[in-house]
């Protein structure tokens, strides 16, 4: 039985381009973000992947990425389930602030701890640990059962919600989290064993400019 799980972070958003903390704010994709999503779909189709169901967050940048990936694959008709639990980490009072301005105000070390630490909350926001506390139950209760039943599953979400998932799938420690990068529009392809552990992982790098 095939147990396929593919994770993809949304393409570049307007606030990614402007170097702003985004969190639960809802900017759309940039032109490059659209191209990244389409490239991900082309690459997945080229390599012979298909999906039976897709999950995404309540935010437009992830939803559009999901739709564009599936459109490129000719799979726009499959069910797309929106889960608020897959939303990006809530950056609280940092949301909408320029990251360089935040570093100037609070210092590099503090901003790095807020962005990359596991259990450090920005003012009024969530830590990665908090984010994992809503993402992982959603994965276990809603996504994983479909994978284990043999459905091929796509998850289009966000840097931090996917970091929480990858931490578990890859067996990473809290100390390894600061170095974990989830790139925009790059599919992470997992095949799972019968006991839900990871059998294999493939990173599908894409040529964003091809086919534009």
From Swiss-Prot:
GO terms for biological process: gluconeogenesis; glycolytic process. Disulfide bonds: none annotated. SUPFAM superfamilies: Phosphoglycerate mutase-like. It catalyses: (2R)-2-phosphoglycerate = (2R)-3-phosphoglycerate. Keywords: Gluconeogenesis, Glycolysis, Isomerase. The gene is gpmA. It comes from Methylobacterium radiotolerans (strain ATCC 27329 / DSM 1819 / JCM 2831 / NBRC 15690 / NCIMB 10815 / 0-1). Its EC number is 5.4.2.11. It holds the Pfam family His_Phos_1. Homodimer. This is 2,3-bisphosphoglycerate-dependent phosphoglycerate mutase. It comes from the Bacteria. Belongs to the phosphoglycerate mutase family. BPG-dependent PGAM subfamily. Pathway: Carbohydrate degradation; glycolysis; pyruvate from D-glyceraldehyde 3-phosphate: step 3/5. Catalyzes the interconversion of 2-phosphoglycerate and 3-phosphoglycerate. The keyword Isomerase applies. GO terms for molecular function: phosphoglycerate mutase activity. Coiled coil: none annotated. The active site is at residues 10, 88. InterPro entries: His_Pase_superF_clade-1 (IPR013078), His_PPase_superfam (IPR029033), PG/BPGM_mutase_AS (IPR001345), Phosphogly_mut1 (IPR005952). Substrate binds at residues 9-16, 22-23, 61, 88-91, 99, 115-116, 159-160. The record marks 158 as: Transition state stabilizer.
């Amino acid at each position: 039985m095939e147990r396929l799980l593919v994770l993809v972070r949304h393409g570049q958003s307007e606030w990614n381009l402007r170097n702003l903390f985004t969190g639960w704010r809802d900017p759309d994709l940039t032109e490059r973000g659209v191209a990244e999503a389409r490239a991900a779909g082309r690459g997945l189709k080229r390599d012979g992947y298909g999906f039976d169901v897709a999950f995404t967050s309540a935010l437009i940048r992830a939803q559009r990425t999901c739709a564009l990936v599936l459109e490129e694959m000719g799979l726009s008709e499959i069910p797309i389930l929106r889960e608020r639990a897959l939303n990006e980490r809530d950056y609280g009072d940092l949301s909408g602030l320029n990251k360089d301005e935040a570093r100037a105000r609070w210092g590099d070390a503090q901003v790095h701890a807020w962005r990359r630490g596991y259990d450090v909350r920005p003012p009024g926001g969530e830590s990665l640990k908090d984010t994992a506390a809503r993402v992982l139950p959603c994965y276990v209760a809603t996504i994983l059962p479909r994978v284990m039943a043999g459905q091929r599953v796509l998850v289009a979400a966000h840097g931090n919600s996917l970091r929480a998932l990858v931490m578990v799938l890859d067996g990473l420690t809290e100390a390894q989290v600061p170095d974990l990068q989830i790139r925009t529009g790059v599919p992470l392809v997992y095949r799972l064993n019968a006991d839900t552990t990871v059998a294999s992982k493939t990173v599908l790098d894409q040529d964003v400019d091809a086919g534009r």
